[in-house]
């Protein structure tokens, strides 16, 4: 197996490129199936968030992944290759560990990425695109990333892009309590935004979602009025803050819609935060007076502030990554001995059972127990050592001192340096 991590993220690609390869939930099954149709790909999972799209797979031909990604999203291979990275083998494991631990996130140490990776893995398992090769790799990565976060402290007081969004609102509005917030979207990011805003004192929510049931759940938890996406034009003028985080493929809030809302508000300021990739709000909305529009890329400068403690924790986490990587390599190598160990143990167990049953029959027949046990012990030792003894004699005859040293190591013995004197 060759583990490969291939993709692009907020460090390598701007938002207008990332949104073109973002994986829509409705596309997930078909894309995974399409990926597994490639004869070069044995198993695969796809992770897609607002900041990254990554393919994790078992393949000996990683170059096909970029070609496939470009073809599926109708992009030029030459264009996409400028932003794409491919990590193989040990480097692929290291990259994935860094992603799962939050070290590669825009907000260093944010915990959501681990949950998102687990969801991508679980979905691939259900679909059957992750099987015996990738399953133990992912399970190791999940265990290791949890240890890294705990030991480094990088996961202490967890933050996320959603939390950064709330902090940005706090910089522009001094009083959370008086705000009317229009939340569009009911996914994980939207839920986190609602949670943090509610904790800061916001109680006036308008919540719209393509799935009305999901919006109702948020409204029940944090209070507020439940709306459909079609209600946005009517209720947009009531919002001081608009936070949109849907999975729509195209923008649905345009300049004219916001301009109309401003007129209804007598041009009172509006704060719009587009956390979606692809974007929900057209960029030219920012041309309007009294409108403050931000997207996920705009959060980067804010995220950099006040991160000293997390960066210190990240240094420790990087050291732990190297340690976990060494552990993984040793663990992965040990898998090669798994079948040998299993077969050897089964063989020894079978021999022991055969001799035990023979001894029990003799005892049942009235033979002296001490004599039977002595014979049982001798016969068992002879049978267990028969094949190794033949092998040791052969390698001694072949003058393979290296194999004899290995045998001494395996049998934990400090016997003579050679079983037989060299015949000159």
From Swiss-Prot:
It catalyses: (S)-4-amino-5-oxopentanoate + tRNA(Glu) + NADP(+) = L-glutamyl-tRNA(Glu) + NADPH + H(+). The gene is hemA. Catalyzes the NADPH-dependent reduction of glutamyl-tRNA(Glu) to glutamate 1-semialdehyde (GSA). Homodimer. GO terms for biological process: protoporphyrinogen IX biosynthetic process from glutamate. It is an enzyme of class 1 (oxidoreductase). Belongs to the glutamyl-tRNA reductase family. This is Glutamyl-tRNA reductase. NCBIfam families: hemA (TIGR01035). Keywords: NADP, Oxidoreductase, Porphyrin biosynthesis. The active site is at residue 50. Substrate binds at residues 49-52, 105, 110-112, 116. Its EC number is 1.2.1.70. It comes from the Bacteria. One of its GO terms (molecular function) is NADP binding. During catalysis, the active site Cys acts as a nucleophile attacking the alpha-carbonyl group of tRNA-bound glutamate with the formation of a thioester intermediate between enzyme and glutamate, and the concomitant release of tRNA(Glu). The thioester intermediate is finally reduced by direct hydride transfer from NADPH, to form the product GSA. The record marks 95 as: Important for activity. Signal peptide: none annotated. The keyword Oxidoreductase applies. Possesses an unusual extended V-shaped dimeric structure with each monomer consisting of three distinct domains arranged along a curved 'spinal' alpha-helix. The N-terminal catalytic domain specifically recognizes the glutamate moiety of the substrate. The second domain is the NADPH-binding domain, and the third C-terminal domain is responsible for dimerization. NADP(+) binds at residues 185-190. Pathway: Porphyrin-containing compound metabolism; protoporphyrin-IX biosynthesis; 5-aminolevulinate from L-glutamyl-tRNA(Glu): step 1/2.
């Amino acid at each position: 197996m060759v583990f490969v991590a291939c993709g692009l993220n907020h460090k390598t690609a701007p938002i207008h490129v990332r949104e073109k390869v973002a994986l829509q939930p409705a596309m997930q099954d078909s894309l995974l199936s399409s990926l597994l149709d490639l004869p070069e790909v044995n198993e695969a999972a796809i992770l897609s968030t607002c900041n990254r799209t990554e393919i994790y797979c078992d393949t000996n031909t990683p170059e096909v992944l970029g070609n496939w990604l470009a073809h599926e999203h109708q992009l030029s291979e030459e264009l996409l290759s400028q932003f794409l990275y491919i990590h193989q083998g040990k480097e692929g494991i290291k990259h994935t560990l860094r992603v799962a631990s939050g070290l590669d996130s825009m907000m260093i140490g944010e915990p959501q990425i681990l949950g998102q990776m687990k969801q991508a893995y679980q979905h691939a398992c259900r679909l059957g695109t992750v099987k015996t090769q990738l399953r133990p790799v992912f399970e190791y990565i999940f265990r290791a990333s949890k240890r890294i976060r705990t030991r480094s402290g990088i996961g202490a007081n967890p933050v996320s892009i959603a939390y950064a969004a709330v902090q940005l609102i706090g910089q522009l509005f001094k009083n959370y309590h008086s705000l009317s917030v229009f939340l569009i979207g009911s996914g994980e990011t939207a839920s986190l935004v609602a949670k943090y805003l509610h904790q800061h004192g916001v109680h006036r929510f308008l919540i719209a979602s393509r799935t009305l049931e999901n919006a109702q759940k948020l409204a029940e938890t944090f209070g507020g009025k439940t709306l459909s996406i079609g209600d946005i034009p009517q209720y947009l003028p009531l919002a001081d803050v608009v936070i949109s985080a849907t999975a729509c493929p195209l923008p649905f809030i345009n300049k004219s819609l916001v301009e109309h809302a401003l007129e209804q508000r007598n041009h009172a300021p509006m704060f719009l935060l587009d956390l979606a990739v692809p974007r929900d709000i057209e960029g030219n909305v920012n041309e309007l007076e009294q409108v403050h529009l931000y997207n996920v890329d705009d959060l980067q400068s804010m995220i950099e502030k006040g991160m000293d403690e997390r960066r210190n924790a990240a240094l420790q986490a990087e050291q732990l990554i190297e340690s976990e990587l060494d552990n993984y390599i040793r663990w992965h190598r040990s898998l090669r001995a798994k079948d040998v160990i299993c077969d050897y143990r089964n063989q020894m167990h079978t021999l022991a059972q055969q001799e035990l049953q023979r001894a029990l029959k003799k005892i049942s027949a009235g033979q002296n127990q001490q004599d039977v046990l002595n014979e049982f012990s001798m016969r068992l030792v002879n049978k267990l050592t028969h094949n190794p003894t033949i092998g040791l004699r052969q390698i001694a005859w072949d003058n393979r001192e290296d194999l004899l040293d290995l045998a001494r190591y395996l049998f934990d013995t400090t016997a003579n340096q050679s079983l037989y004197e060299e015949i000159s």
